[in-house]
């Protein structure tokens, strides 16, 4: 059994010097894509993991498959696309917060139902996905169909809100529709403090009313990243709300690329370690706090 993700896999071209991309001369390539990063981190934490996606039948696609195999991430369900190229993103470093230029109409945007063998669900102990893969058809419909089928079979679901308004362009209403769909399917949700505030504003609720999100979408575990303030975890057990806030170790940030993905992986790894993937709402406060400390280690 493995934790699987269905979502984007791409090449991160990360600038080797600070400054705008039109001035940068050197980049280094790494495997990327938020859900893919989560699976790599899980594998490094000793949790069996796998990826369901699509890459181009090109050198970059082959590079990704090779690197993921080296990380012991199962790629048996990654298909090759002979029409669309492997996804790429350019990452520019300006201060501690990176900025991204992501290209659309790439292989992972064209995952179709025929690309996925539903037999993989027999080997899934948790299914993870995020909102970026929902930007474009046919991947949107394919992913939602697959997640809904996993949910129907009782497989726990985790969702990374990961709001990227630039990818949705003029379709912001469509973005919110799909973010809400992801929230409604998920048992575990990860979002940033900024994303939490945006969702509450969209719902017409005050910023301090965020526990209502657990009831609004029937979420079992809500994990909120708070940057330099650490993280907050909220768990609903029947009528009882359990919450822990974890302060961070104080460090000087150099590059925050992938930090949220490492956070997401640590949450899943904590649930796996406590054998609570299928009984998330039975976490006690000590276990919840331990999972919180995993995030900032």
Residue ranges and their predicted role:
Residues 3, 148, 203-297:
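Conserved phosphate-binding/catalytic region of the ribokinase-like
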Residues 77, 126, 187-188, 221:
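Well-ordered beta-strand positions
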Residues 42, 192, 260:
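Short, conserved phosphate/pyrophosphate- and ester-handling motifs at nucleotide-, phospho-/glycolipid
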Residues 135-212, 219, 229-230, 236:
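Conserved beta-alpha-beta core of the PfkB/ribokinase-like small-molecule kinase fold
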Residues 48-131:
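Conserved N-terminal subdomain of the carbohydrate kinase-like
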Residues 9, 132, 161, 262:
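Active-site metal-binding loops of divalent metal-dependent hydrolases
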Residues 1-74:
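Glycine-rich phosphate/adenosyl-contacting loop at the front of the ribokinase-like
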């Amino acid at each position: 059994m493995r934790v699987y993700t269905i979502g984007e896999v791409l090449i991160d071209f990360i600038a080797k010097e600070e400054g705008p991309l039109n001035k940068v001369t050197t980049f280094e390539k790494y495997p990327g894509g938020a859900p893919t990063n989560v699976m790599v981190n899980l594998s490094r934490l000793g949790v069996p993991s796998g990826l369901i996606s699509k890459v181009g039948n090109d050198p970059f696609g082959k590079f990704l498959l090779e690197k993921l195999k080296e990380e012991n991430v199962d790629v048996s369900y990654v298909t090759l696309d002979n029409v669309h190229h492997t996804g790429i993103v350019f990452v520019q470093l300006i201060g501690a917060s990176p900025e991204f230029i992501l290209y659309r109409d790439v292989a992972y945007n064209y995952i179709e139902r025929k690309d996925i063998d539903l037999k993989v669900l027999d080997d899934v102990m948790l299914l993870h996905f995020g909102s970026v893969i929902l930007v474009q058809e046919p991947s949107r419909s394919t992913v939602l169909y697959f997640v809904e089928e996993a949910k129907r079979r009782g497989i726990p679901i985790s969702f990374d809100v990961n709001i990227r308004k630039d990818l949705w362009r003029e379709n912001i209403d469509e973005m919110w529709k799909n973010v809400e769909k992801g929230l409604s399917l998920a048992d575990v949700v990860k979002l940033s403090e900024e994303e939490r505030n945006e969702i509450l504003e969209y719902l017409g609720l005050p910023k301090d009313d965020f526990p209502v999100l657990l009831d609004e979408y029937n979420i079992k575990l809500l994990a909120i990243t708070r940057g330099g303030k650490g993280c907050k975890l909220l768990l609903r057990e029947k009528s009882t709300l359990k919450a822990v806030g974890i302060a961070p170790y104080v460090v000087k940030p150099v590059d925050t690329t992938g930090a949220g993905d490492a956070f997401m992986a640590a949450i899943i790894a904590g649930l796996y370690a406590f054998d609570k993937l299928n009984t998330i709402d039975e976490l006690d406060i000590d276990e919840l706090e331990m999972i919180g400390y995993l995030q900032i280690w």
